[in-house]
């Protein structure tokens, strides 16, 4: 059964980028392929810091948080592109925009994600 390490799932307003100010559901993965000194989510660098969850468990948590003003699910991390099949599996359960907040270093993995509307990366 497919599982991925998840730090947290929460609803909040996007604080940066094109969708600033919009309510989103955030799925924060654990694990990153880099070790940036300026990282603002140090607790998510190691995959061991997350709770292993199935796509259905994540989808259930997202459903609990959905409100009428929420139109986007943002997958963040750590590095969410480490889990392309998992993101594809969760995304197919929702008719919402799918955003990936990524370091951009795994373009082949990003291409594997079936339904992506927005890719936001840090240079």
Model features per residue range: what roles?
Residues 4-8, 23-24, 38-114:
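Conserved Radical SAM active-site core
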Residues 28, 76, 120:
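Short beta-strand segments
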Residues 115-123:
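Non-cysteine beta-strand/loop elements that form the S-adenosyl-L-methionine
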Residues 2-38:
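N-terminal pre-triad scaffold of radical SAM enzymes
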